């Protein structure tokens, strides 16, 4: 195991524990966010350059509110991927919908484990409606594998729903037969 992998696993374990320990208090969240910022700054060269251009680094930041936020256009720059790993190691890539421009942003993952865990934890923590019988007005994740929203609802479907109906068909239209038979 190399140094980068060791750091990555440590950061992931801290985030995973924070997700499981919800609600997290402000001080613990601040400590976690500063740790993630330091990791991202150290391992994500594109983000490090962005922070450097702003005159910021982990030694100057004491509160998570002050962590430099990337503009959404930064995710559209293929030549500067926002990852802490080689892009070729991504097991999942989500794309933005592309509604604002023709260039779609990219968000790469080596694993969606934390992402999936946070979806279920947030759903339960926020006391969102019972999902045991779910109607999804979006494409099934198999039809739209680059959609983070479809992925999120797929996680809800797999982990919380006893019955799921996906109402958008492959052409992007509402499947009226499924809708009528479900209601």
Predicted regions and their residues:
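Active-site phosphate/ATP/adenylate-binding loop shared across adenylate-forming ligases
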Residues: 3-4, 14, 18-20, 54, ...
